[in-house]
Amino acid sequence: MAAQINPSILSADFARLADEAKAVEGADWLHVDVMDNHFVPNLTLGVPVVESLARATDTPLDCHLMIEAPDRWAPQYVEAGAGSVTFHAEAAAAPVRLAREIRAKGARASMALKPATPVEPYEDLLPELDMLLIMTVEPGFGGQAFLDIMLPKIRRTRELIKKHGLELWLQVDGGVSAATIERCADAGADVFVAGSAVYGASDPAEAVRALRTQADAATAEASWSCDH
């Protein structure tokens, strides 16, 4: 699969979200960070903004729910127009049931793991998912430095995906930039959330294209891709 670049609107101008979405129309998805000031120490946006964004852009929405009680709230984001909904393993009471509900409502189901959460306990759950998100920073704030210590975890996750023959996307989020995206792709990631690296650029659309080119080149040389 070709690398996918998902600009994070956490780094966009919140007063101009519709315009900021249009500025990256060549992106694969628009990454929407939902934070509740409980699961993470920050508060961003909710269902009404997602509904408005879904009307304002043709780019599908990739909603990352950094919230408590995702079992209750995640289905509402599908109804609001999200094409993919990510809940956190650390917050979900019944992740299999929730993933199935998200899928039943018509969206892709994704689960996120914080840096300290190992992937191995969730191996048997992976077939229930369309994507797994490996956080490469502590969730809650944009603009953080990439955690290199997550690269072995990305590799182990890719190995699990191959072991089970899954068509599971592997997303990374946090500190992804021109300086780090190739390492992520080499380790096994194929979906890349980029905030500051896109919206901090003078030409966000060109930044998306450049990141995709870098990721595709690194993937082509990666051992996991050559073995696929």
From Swiss-Prot:
Cofactor note: Binds 1 divalent metal cation per subunit.
Keywords: Carbohydrate metabolism, Isomerase, Metal-binding
Keyword Transcription: no
Residues annotated for a divalent metal cation binding in this entry: 31, 33, 64, 173
Binding residue positions for substrate: 8, 64, 140-143, 173-175, 195-196
One of the record's GO molecular function terms: metal ion binding
Alphabetical list of InterPro entries matching this protein: Aldolase_TIM, Ribul_P_3_epim, Ribul_P_3_epim-like, RibuloseP-bd_barrel
Cofactor(s) of this protein: a divalent metal cation
Pathway assigned to this chain's UniProt record: Carbohydrate degradation
Gene Ontology annotations of biological process type: carbohydrate metabolic process; pentose catabolic process; pentose-phosphate shunt, non-oxidative branch
Catalytic activity, reaction form: D-ribulose 5-phosphate = D-xylulose 5-phosphate
SUPFAM superfamilies the record matches: Ribulose-phoshate binding barrel
A single Gene Ontology CC term: cytosol
Catalytic residues (positions): 33 (proton acceptor), 173 (proton donor)
Pfam families: Ribul_P_3_epim (PF00834)
Protein EC: 5.1.3.1
CDD domains: RPE
Function, in words: Catalyzes the reversible epimerization of D-ribulose 5-phosphate to D-xylulose 5-phosphate.
Family, similarity comment: Belongs to the ribulose-phosphate 3-epimerase family.
Name by which UniProt lists this protein: Ribulose-phosphate 3-epimerase
Organism of provenance: Streptomyces coelicolor (strain ATCC BAA-471 / A3(2) / M145)
Gene name of the record: rpe
